[in-house]
Amino acid sequence: MKTFIYFKIAILFLVFSIHAQDSIPKAQVFKSIQTLKTGSQNYKFNTLAGTMELRDEKNKPIALHGFTAYFKQGETKNRPIVFSFNGGPGSSSYWLHMGIMGPKRIVVTDPDYNKAAPYKLLDNPYSILDMADVVMMDPIGTGLSELIGESKG
């Protein structure tokens, strides 16, 4: 009897696992407006955070590639764009984002060891956003990025 129950549980697990693999998540992008204050200047940015779908040579979806992007509002004709590929394996671009490149930064007291969150959040006067737009990208398998479809597993 016990073996039969384990068999039923295994079948249910397989059925729900197969169903979960059939649903491929869709790329999403979230938009907001952020402000960076450096010295006496205030800069407004269009902020995008989300994922973009990557496809293979047969046009099958293989991954969602995560990103966070800041684009200055106003005159942008000759403004450079910095593409930042940080993180991995196992770590997203979060620490580069919240440590130096983004409009905000977290305050840490020790460069070698820090306690768990929550961290104090401040405007980031060291950000390069006053000089360039920034696109931070998470390697596949970190942060917002993930394998999807037949590539998963």
Task: List where the protein language model places each region.
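Catalytic-loop region of hydrolases
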Residues: A20-I81, G99
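Hydrophobic alpha-helical segments and their boundary regions
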Residues: Y6-I9, V29, S127
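N-terminal cap/lid subdomain of alpha/beta-hydrolase-fold enzymes
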Residues: P61-G153
